[in-house]
Amino acid sequence: NISEADRQFVLKYMSQYPTESLYPPYADEPQTYWPVYCKFLLFGAEKNKLPDNIRIFNKPGDAYGHLIDAAYIVDFKNKIEFFLSAVIYCNSDGILNDDKYDYDNIGKPFMKNLGELIYDYELKRIYKNRPDLSPFLFTYDLLPK
């Protein structure tokens, strides 16, 4: 079993953006770790700041041409939430372990478009009951710049 304190810890740090982190000090390297760094679903490789009403709790990864993201995405303003997980193979030359993968030109645009498609669907979907998202509001280490 996981304690409530441990659960809150995991949720907070899965949703914290690099620019909100004290340790490691990702905020010191904004060219390398921008606000939506590793938030592939919905934002791909964009370096824009995330809207204040959206928070993404995710575990991303990449290895041997596979780009992976598993996310719980919440929009506090519109009171929508959804889970989305995707794995895409981004290796057009078929050679593994050559560090030549198509993450930026195939994988991340796909992830962004997939996330946007589901987000737009959820915005239009009729809900019988809107979720209470207040348990997912956290105070982060640093305020975004």
Short names for language-model regions:
Residues 1-145:
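Structured C-terminal helix/loop/strand segments within mature extracytoplasmic catalytic/sensor domains
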